[in-house]
Amino acid sequence: SVLAGKELSEIKTFFPIRKNIIRLMLNLPISFNSGTIIFYSLQKNINKDKDIFLLNLLGKVYEVKSEKFFDLITAIVGSGPAFFYYLLESMQKTAVSQGLNKIFSKQILKETFIGTSKIIENTESNFDDLRQSVTSKGGTTDAAITSLRKKEFAKLINNSVKDAIKKAKTLSSKK
């Protein structure tokens, strides 16, 4: 199942004969075999080579041991790409409003994002350390990060994730 907010016990009622039903949350990058796939199963002896091997073709597969995290996972994994798209969209609008060509601004934002993704993929550094490695005290990046902090950007992201969690709970009618 990839239904947001629907618990495995509820889904299982539609398939009473099936013993091994898994709950999935995945994201759009599966279209390019680069997705994040999270699964949970009531059956504890999942044979990953047999039962979920096809999922590995779509991206990285992770098992969670408790279904209680699925609303959070839905918000982060399922909605996560939209967060990044919205950030890029906002940066592009700013670039265009400051005089850059729309096509050119998309190209340089795309390459910046892809390059940044490759750094994340190829290092064990945490996000804070990576951000700090780009941020020179008193520099342009520092000014931008300071502005984001003053506007409580982290709190805005936190509240946005919580709103997505709340929506997932509403979809399952659980409070």
Predicted segment positions?
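ADP-ribose/adenylate-binding Rossmann-like module
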Residues: 1-6
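Internal alpha-helical scaffold of NAD(P)-dependent oxidoreductase catalytic cores
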Residues: 10, 14-20, 36-72, 83-124
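NAD(P)-dependent Rossmann-like dehydrogenase/reductase catalytic/cofactor-binding core
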Residues: 110-175
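Rossmann-like dinucleotide/flavin-binding elements
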Residues: 30-32
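Active-site glycine-rich loop that binds ribose-phosphate moieties when present
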Residues: 23
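Alpha-helical membrane segments and immediately flanking helix-loop junctions
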Residues: 76-77
